[in-house]
Amino acid sequence: MADEQNLDTQNPEAQAAENAAPSDDLAARVQALEEQLAAAQDQSLRMAAELQNVRRRAEQDVEKAHKFALEKFANDLLPVVDSLERGLELSSPDDEAIKGVREGMQLTLKLFIDTLARHQLEAVEPHGEPFNPEHHQAMAMEESTHVEPNSVLKVFQKGYLLNGRLLRPAMVVVSKAPTTPPPSIDEQA
């Protein structure tokens, strides 16, 4: 045993290497654990951000579903409004025989339009306005000297917006500049 102690004291380099080996192992292990911790923290932050994004998207989807739940139903009701309006346009206000029916149609139409407005459904009536391809569908072009080119001359069918989003475009006739005939030979001479 004395020989072993003697050898240990005679070879301090071996003893230092022996002591250094566990400390190098510990340092490497600490570094590996720190890297794992950093990776876990990064993954945790990413998961928290993803969870927040999923919640936000779900809230937006629910909000849109509430906002536009009536879209299909409202689209199905628009022909009824159109028919009531056409019926009133075609009936004579001076005809005493249908005066009561006409008043009933007017009241029904007003009630219908008020109900649609309560549910954020608004009409697009572009008569005289500049043509807007986002809200209007051009059915025809007509020359006109009375209004500027590319203005709405007539409205065949009103358009509608639901909560600011286009439900149905307005069917319109759009003005265009009159074509000037080429000068004749007599005018050139």
From Swiss-Prot:
GO terms for biological process: protein folding. This is Protein GrpE. PANTHER family: GRPE PROTEIN, GRPE PROTEIN HOMOLOG, MITOCHONDRIAL. It comes from Ectopseudomonas mendocina (strain ymp) (Pseudomonas mendocina). Keywords: Chaperone, Cytoplasm, Stress response. Homodimer. It comes from the Bacteria. Pfam families: GrpE.
